């Protein structure tokens, strides 16, 4: 869970704030699913470089007086374009072997929001989510309807295989094999044996990423406005149009200038059931809790 960038400035002296309005940006590339022992120095360099580039893109906009929303979109767009992350290019695959992408954004000043779910052909879902917020009367558009809206605005369409990578195909194959192993065990009537027993540690480390690979950003601009954004490919081997918390305002994303901005990453079903992002803001607003306490309690 990533908390508000406003927290970074909660202790700043008033005099300093008047001379130089605070601003900041925080990003995440997933909830820490990569096993350090499995990561090569080259891979770590690649991940750190990609995260730094996204951070720099958003931070530079803020430094020049850009809005929090601009910064969030700029940072997330770079993560969507990088195949290392489970968002945009490099997203995980559904059971059918395609990418279905979700994204959302929220402006904390007026609590406006936009989201898309299940899109397959829009290159940068975070930009489409912002368009839903800025250029439609709606909050969420889904599937082909969202794609038609993108077409009406001239968004770039790409074939679905643009998003797909060999690494994600391998993860999908592992997930399918685990499903088949579980089915075999059920037929044998041996629930005591874990399906994981049929796979090596490295197989499981590879498969672990399928649960937590969401990317996101929160920002505070010089005008004191907060924004939050989240983008994801969801879970490997997901079925039946499954949608997690990332595009759901109040669950995986929330921003309110009066409290905080939140971009969540983790098991989406739990974030939805607990309405986590909004709960954090509500505990700050109504219980007077600081952001860290609110996050632990939500």
Language-model regions: role of each:
Residues 1-11:
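Bacterial N-terminal signal peptides
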Residues 10-18:
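Signal peptide processing junction and immediate N-terminal pro/mature segment
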Residues 17-298:
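Alpha/propeptide regions of enzymes that mature by internal proteolysis
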């Amino acid at each position: 869970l990533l908390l508000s960038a406003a927290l970074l400035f909660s202790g700043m002296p008033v005099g300093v704030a008047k001379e130089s309005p605070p601003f900041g940006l925080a990003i995440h590339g997933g909830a820490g699913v990569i096993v350090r022992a499995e990561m090569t120095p080259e891979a770590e360099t690649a991940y750190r470089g990609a995260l730094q580039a996204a951070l720099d893109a958003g931070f530079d906009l803020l430094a020049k007086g850009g809005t929090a929303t601009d910064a969030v979109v700029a940072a997330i767009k770079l993560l969507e374009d990088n195949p290392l992350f489970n968002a945009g290019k490099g997203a995980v695959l559904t059971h059918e072997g395609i990418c279905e992408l979700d994204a959302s954004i929220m402006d904390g000043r007026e609590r406006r929001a936009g989201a898309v779910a299940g899109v397959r052909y829009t290159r940068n879902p975070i930009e489409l989510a912002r368009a839903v917020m800025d250029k439609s009367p709606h909050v969420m558009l889904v599937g082909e309807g969202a794609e038609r809206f993108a077409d009406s605005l001239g968004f770039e369409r790409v074939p679905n295989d643009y998003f797909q990578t060999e690494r994600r195909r391998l993860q999908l194959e592992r997930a399918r094999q685990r499903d088949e192993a579980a089915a075999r065990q059920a037929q044998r009537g041996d629930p005591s044996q874990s399906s994981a027993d049929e796979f090596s540690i490295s197989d499981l480390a590879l498969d672990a990423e399928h649960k937590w690979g969401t990317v996101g950003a929160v920002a505070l601009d010089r005008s004191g406005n907060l924004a939050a954004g989240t983008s994801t490919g969801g879970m490997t081997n997901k079925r039946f149009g499954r949608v997690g918390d990332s595009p759901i305002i109040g669950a995986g994303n929330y921003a309110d200038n009066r409290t905080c901005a939140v971009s969540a990453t983790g098991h989406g079903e739990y974030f939805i059931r607990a309405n986590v992002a909004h709960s954090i803001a509500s505990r700050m607003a109504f219980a007077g809790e600081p952001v860290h306490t609110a996050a632990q309690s939500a």
